[in-house]
């Protein structure tokens, strides 16, 4: 990894940790930032890590000590893919890439109307569309409206129904995107609207996130560049704790 890419990866990791902290707060959970990692001492919401490293070569023992590993399901986002947590009974769930896109308009114009959810009913409609019947719509709570750096982006059809979306989280240097979806066409259909919204809302900030597999290829087609690897480690095996949706 080049020095520039490492700086970009660190900015993306910090932004992602700030989003994980916001999601935890929306569920009434306390967490804390320290020099090497963000961590929550109690189990975080489903699909969200209990810790995110902020620098390369974080101290493993101190990191594991900050989270609850008394039961299966604890997870760590190893932001630089440089830790070995096997001795603490963790296994790699999946690997991914941090992605970065300079601040600029999308190459493809959006075909939906996009806005920021600003009331509980819209957050609920967004959550139901994001979940698409998989049983986790309560993950996204109206308390997210109290987070000044978090923006739930809703793409609406001509009849006003939420059919696409993403979450944007602003930090000092970047704006992070996660949970991108479209009921028809998947992330490929959602990215133009999301990037157009970011260009309007934060015209000077680059966009970051992380993806893997087919979703990484889609992000690259929309102007992103991979800037560094990461790993998700899972304590024991508990398939409903984490998925690969890019949180």
Outline where the language-model segments fall.
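Terminal substrate-recognition subdomain of acyl/acetyltransferases
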Residues: 1-28, 38-43, 102-107, 169-171, ...
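Acyl-donor-binding surface of acyltransferase catalytic domains
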Residues: 54-120, 195-199, 204-217, 221-239
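N-terminal charged segments
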Residues: 1-70, 130-149, 246-247
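Short glycine-aromatic motifs
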Residues: 29-31, 89-90, 150, 224
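Conserved acetyl-CoA pyrophosphate-binding loop and the N-cap/start of the following alpha-helix
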Residues: 185-197
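A short, well-structured alpha-helix characteristic of acyl/acetyltransferase catalytic modules
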Residues: 119-129, 245
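A conserved beta-strand-loop-helix scaffold within acyl/acetyltransferase catalytic domains
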Residues: 135-183, 228
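A short, internal acetyl-CoA/4′-phosphopantetheine-binding micro-motif in the GNAT/acyltransferase core
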Residues: 52-58, 180-187
């Amino acid at each position: 990894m080049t020095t520039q890419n490492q700086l970009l990866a660190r900015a993306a990791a910090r932004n992602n940790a700030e989003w994980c902290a916001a999601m935890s707060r929306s569920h009434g959970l306390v967490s804390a930032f320290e020099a090497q990692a963000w961590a929550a001492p109690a189990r975080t919401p489903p699909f969200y890590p209990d810790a995110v490293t902020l620098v390369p070569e974080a101290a493993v023992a101190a990191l594991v000590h900050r989270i609850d590993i008394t039961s299966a399901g604890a997870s760590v986002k190893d932001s630089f893919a440089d830790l070995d947590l096997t001795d603490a009974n963790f296994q790699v769930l999946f690997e991914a890439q941090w992605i970065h896109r300079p601040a600029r308009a999308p190459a493809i114009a959006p075909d939906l109307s996009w806005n920021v959810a600003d009331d509980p009913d819209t957050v609920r409609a967004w959550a139901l569309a994001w979940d698409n019947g998989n049983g986790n719509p309560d993950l996204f709570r109206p308390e997210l409206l109290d987070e000044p750096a978090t923006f739930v982006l809703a793409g609406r059809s001509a009849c006003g129904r939420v059919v696409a979306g993403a979450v944007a989280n602003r930090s000092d240097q970047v704006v992070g995107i996660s949970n991108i979806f479209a009921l028809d066409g998947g992330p490929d259909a959602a990215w133009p609207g999301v990037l157009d919204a970011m260009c309007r809302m934060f015209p000077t900030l680059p966009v970051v996130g992380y993806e893997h597999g087919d979703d990484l290829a889609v992000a690259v087609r929309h102007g992103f560049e991979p800037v560094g690897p990461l790993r998700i480690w899972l304590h024991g095996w508990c398939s409903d704790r984490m998925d690969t949706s890019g949180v």
